[in-house]
Amino acid sequence: MPVITLPDGSKREFAHPVSTLDVAADIGPGLAKACIAGRVNGELKDACDLIETDAELSIITAKDEEGIEILRHSCAHLLGHAIKQLWPQTKMAIGPVIDNGFYYDIDLEHKLTQEDIEALEKRMLELAKTNYDVVKRVVSWQEARDTFAARGEEYKIAILDENISKDATPALYHHEEYTDMCRGPHVPNMRFCHHFKLMSIAGAYWRGNSENKMLQRIYGTAWADKKALSTHLARLEEAAKRDHRKIGKQLDLYHMQEEAPGMVFWHNDGWSIFLELERFIRRKLNQYTYQEVKGPLMMDRVLWERSGHWDKYSEAMFTTSSENREYAVKPMNCPGHVQIFNQGLKSYRDLPLRMAEFGCCHRNEPSGSLHGLMRVRGFTQDDAHIFCTEDQVQAEVSSCIQMVYDTYSTFGFENIVVKLSTRPEKRIGDDAMWDRAEEALKQALRAKNIEFTILPGEGAFYGPKIEFTLHDCLDRAWQCGTVQLDYALPSRLGATYVAEDNSRQTPVMIHRAILGSLERFLGILIEEYAGRFPTWLAPMQVVVMNITDKQADYVEEVVKFFKEQGIRASFDLRNEKIGFKIREHTLRRVPYLLVVGDQEMENKEVAVRTRDGVDLGKMRIEDFAAKIHQQISLRSLKLLEE
């Protein structure tokens, strides 16, 4: 007689084993209709799975995040169902859930076209609208293998042979005549899977190994209702308009080419923004009392072996050799910073020592993963390492957190998700050390009233970590900032200081990044602002235009004055209509468009309008410069208003 405890603490007693669906029906028909799955004693289960003993139960619906993931997973099976109807010879590989959707890798000789995808989506909807039940069967390993062998599903057989123990009991999910294998759970009925769209096709190697066969990967998205799907598709459409690769080309910010994959060719305007970002962070470093250093681009392999990077990271490192010595181009700055710390005797009085670098790093990312500025091989890291005593950890972490929030708010990012990764199973140090380290990070976050979630076991083997993920205007998540404690690297590389009792001690090292990669952060900003940078970041802040040749000399004087004031300004003296000039510079997203006619020239004024089309009227050039200076010094995100 199982007793089921619900989230509100209420209990329901049953005379026989029950499923989550039975419990939902016992509560009410509405909940039974909405029930997708259950969380039984913390574990997700299919709605049909029987509960035979006392248990805590949460009923999962499409309102829950887990419910959305489950229906997406079931849409992947629905995709398989439709594929096998349209192309019966298809061999199915894997079909997992991903952010906002799902995909399925398939082996099909016929190369799918956009017309095929549309036909596939249509068939999926036809199948889903029959609202058929999804039937789960738990079978022996051998029966599962025999089932897929009879269907010629070689990839499913490979999964069984290579990944699933022979004494396991795999679950088979039957979608009418189509059968798939999965850990589950899945929706009990296809009425939950009416709101989806197939998005794109790509190539993908089986098992992610380039030595294996290239499969076709079909991506899709799925949501609980029509409104959520429409909202997501509208967001994707807006994201496409904001694509930093497209805007970067339109605004002539940078380019990339095949001869240097994953490496950025910065053009004048893009480099101007990059340098402004760097100047901004440099001012923060001064405010928070950091030393700025510069380490070598590459170092002998021996040093990377001592640091431990060679064992764990060598495949991602670029190497070269000279005079019988092997060198590695640095993928990160930390070992170099320890070398700088080790120069000269350090005392406890020297700590904390905060060392920062705009380090030019390189990582040999797979070519297929490269994506504009967001995923590159050569990048600049706004990296810092703080050497401190264990007693100083909490205060230093607190300072890092403040710096992160100060920085992100300047760019308009207020929605920051914070996660704390704690001790993994394999780790250095004793439990007491980890207790102190994790507690120091927790206290630093709590002291600033920052909500955070704990990721148990997700920390590095050498220390716990805080991750800062910002959400942009399209609610996309970008993990940028990190604060990582390291109890291993200083010891491996021989870093010590003289303690107050004259003993030699190893400092704690705090790895700190705020923007992460400057290239990636600039890509994020391009998309966040859609290329409409705030005045302080804009590569060209002001453009001054004449109406006739008569005003040309005055326009040049105005621009010279602005440049002397430190304002990035240019002129447009072309023999074009003023409306044409305004449109062109509006498309270039220049914040302020200044027009000069006879009257403005006579009164030593300019007619000011913004790229948004707001007419600010006439101003004396000194007054306009003062207003712009104030905007720049405050790093305002808004333009001047009427």
From Swiss-Prot:
Region of interest (Catalytic), residue spans: 243-534
EC main group: ligase
The protein's Enzyme Commission number: 6.1.1.3
Binding site for Zn(2+): C334, H385, H511
Family matches, as PROSITE patterns: AA_TRNA_LIGASE_II, TGS
Stretches assigned to the TGS domain: 1-61
Catalytically driven reaction(s): tRNA(Thr) + L-threonine + ATP = L-threonyl-tRNA(Thr) + AMP + diphosphate + H(+)
Role: Catalyzes the attachment of threonine to tRNA(Thr) in a two-step reaction: L-threonine is first activated by ATP to form Thr-AMP and then transferred to the acceptor end of tRNA(Thr). Also edits incorrectly charged L-seryl-tRNA(Thr).
Protein name: Threonine--tRNA ligase
Species of provenance: Shewanella sp. (strain MR-7)
Gene: thrS
